[in-house]
Amino acid sequence: MPKMKTKSAAKKRFKITATGKVVAAAAGKRHGMIKRTNKFIRDARGTMVLAEADGKKVVKNYLPNGL
């Protein structure tokens, strides 16, 4: 049976660290920033580590061959 293909959309959105954690950009920065606190805007600038359960789902279903 052939290898499962990596999903291109997931390839652009997630990175797998050397320790196996899945990192993604923080959500909530598309619009409506006027009512957000400065702390929220600063924190959303960077990346976040997905919860372990969510990370496993991403790797299993979308990034089977890693990156």
From Swiss-Prot:
GO biological process per UniProt: translation
GO MF annotation terms: structural constituent of ribosome
UniProt cross-references to Gene3D superfamilies, sorted A to Z: 4.10.410.60
Keyword terms: Ribonucleoprotein, Ribosomal protein
GO cellular component, one term: cytosolic large ribosomal subunit
Pfam families per the UniProt record, alphabetical: Ribosomal_L35p
Annotated InterPro entries: Ribosomal_bL35 (IPR001706), Ribosomal_bL35-like (IPR021137), Ribosomal_bL35_CS (IPR018265), Ribosomal_bL35_sf (IPR037229)
PANTHER family the record matches: 54S RIBOSOMAL PROTEIN BL35M, LARGE RIBOSOMAL SUBUNIT PROTEIN BL35M
Matching NCBIfam families: rpmI_bact
Family note: Belongs to the bacterial ribosomal protein bL35 family.
Official protein name in the record: Large ribosomal subunit protein bL35
Name of the encoding gene: rpmI
